[in-house]
Design a protein with these regions (language model features):
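Conserved, mostly hydrophobic/aromatic
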Residues: 11, 46, 81, 157, ...
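Aromatic-lined carbohydrate-binding/catalytic grooves of carbohydrate-active enzymes
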Residues: 25, 29-134
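Glycan-recognition surfaces
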Residues: 108-111, 139, 149, 154-257
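Catalytic cores of secreted or luminal carbohydrate-active enzymes
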Residues: 240-306
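Carbohydrate-binding surface patches
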Residues: 245-248, 253-255, 305-350
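Solvent-exposed beta-hairpin/edge-strand motifs
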Residues: 345-363
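C-terminal beta-strand-rich structural cap/linker in extracellular carbohydrate-active enzymes
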Residues: 369-395
Length: 395
């Protein structure tokens, strides 16, 4: 199968561990991915992010793994990861230095690509720090794409230029398999919802073999690790994040410490219904049915007893294979609210004689055919998700 036929899935070290990585940690993560159902669910890439090398290249011009962190070298790490039925990923940067100040691949693309291939790398995350002001961003990403292909090894190219120069317009053309479309995610509600809001109108450029990457998941981090910031997310907020990543059809790269991940978050990221939506073969983006404001009480202002916080009501509809649909409602406001939506806005006018037969993904409850409108009550910072089929309206 060609690379990235469906959104890539895996685990990346950065969100939790940052520079605190070593061989023992990577082996433990590989063991857990293989033994706790992640591999079977589709999480196949184990990726080491920044801070794995020495601060300077060797005399032969090649990047050298830090012998204190990886005493047996990267080939041994790759071999162990492969022995668990997983694929091995590494990190480099299009600049002269990585984001953490280690050697970047600028002007070393072909030698670095061959080094990665010799070690058995299957996935390269390619960052954008310390890029020369005179450099051509598109040209350097194309150069690394060519360098990877010149090795003869199949290596998934994960381009990470933070959304610079509208990557959705050219990353497919230069051979990337996924492209970061925003700055770094942080472990809080505002960060991940801002990312989604910035990308909803751009997802039609994402699809088979070249996916919009909304960054690694923070689900289950609970404020621990390298990207913790502000208030710790609730279960409902983490569920909202994971559902959005699945619904948007973007790569699912876990970032939490799998050794201490709470059971409810493991179950969430292994939920077969959600993963089936993410991995749907047609790779269609969701259609934006509604994106505006919820109506919530405003007791502090007698002149305006109701508030309408902007960009807080979302209704999204995603077409799936076999004439199935995923219907998503979200309330991003700070108060419980009803999210209203007319079926006509989903392409189902009353005169059509067709209703939407709905089943709640979270509870399993079959709600039956819905027509005219459907207006669920949703808690603050939470969502509802339904799998639906079209049925004749016999009323």
């Amino acid at each position: 199968m060609p690379l990235a036929q469906l959104p890539p899935m895996g685990w990346n070290s950065w969100n939790t561990f940052g520079w605190q990585i070593n061989e023992k940690l990577i082996f433990e993560m590989a063991d857990l991915m293989a033994s706790q159902g992640y591999r079977e669910a589709g999480y196949e890439y184990l990726v080491i992010d920044d801070c794995w090398s020495l601060r300077e290249r060797g005399k032969d011009g090649r990047i050298v793994p830090d012998p204190e962190k990886f005493p047996n070298g990267m080939k041994a790490v790759a071999d162990y990861v492969h022995s668990k039925g997983l694929k091995f990923g590494m990190y480099s940067c299009a600049g002269v230095r990585t984001c953490a100040g280690y050697p970047g691949s600028y002007d070393h693309e072909f030698v670095d690509a061959q080094t990665f291939a010799d070690w058995g790398v299957d996935f390269l995350k390619y960052d954008f720090c310390n890029f020369p002001q005179s450099g051509n961003c598109k040209a350097r990403y194309l150069t690394m794409s060519m360098a990877l292909k010149a090795t003869g090894r199949e290596i998934l190219f994960s381009a990470c230029n933070w959304g610079m120069e509208e990557p959705g317009e050219w990353m497919r053309a230069i051979g990337a398999h996924m492209y970061r479309s925003t700055g770094d995610i942080m472990d809080n509600f505002v960060s991940f919802t801002d990312i989604v809001k910035s990308q909803l109108n751009k997802l039609c450029m994402s699809g088979n073999h070249c996916f919009n990457d909304m960054d690694m998941l923070t689900v289950g981090m609970e404020g621990k690790g390298n990207v913790g910031l502000g208030k710790v997310c609730s279960y409902e907020e983490y569920r909202l994040q994971f559902v959005l990543w699945c619904l948007c059809g973007v790569p699912l790269m876990m970032g939490a410490d799998l050794r201490s991940l709470a059971p409810e978050y493991r179950a969430l990221m292994l939920n077969p219904a959600l993963l089936r939506i993410n991995q749907d073969a047609e790779c269609r983006p969701p259609y934006i049915v509604r994106r505006d404001s919820v109506c919530i009480p405003n007791p502090d202002d007698a002149q305006a007893p109701w508030a309408h916080p902007a960009d807080t009501a979302f209704v999204l509809l995603r077409h799936l294979t076999d004439n199935e649909f995923a219907l998503f409602y979200a309330n991003l406001s700070d108060a419980d609210a009803e999210v209203h939506c007319e079926m006509a806005d989903m392409g189902l006018p009353v005169t059509g004689g067709v209703a939407l037969d709905m089943t709640d993904v979270f509870s399993g409850e079959h709600l039956g055919p819905q027509k005219d409108s459907f207006n669920p009550h949703i808690k603050a910072h939470d969502c509802r998700l339904f799998l639906c089929h079209l049925v004749k309206d016999n009323a």
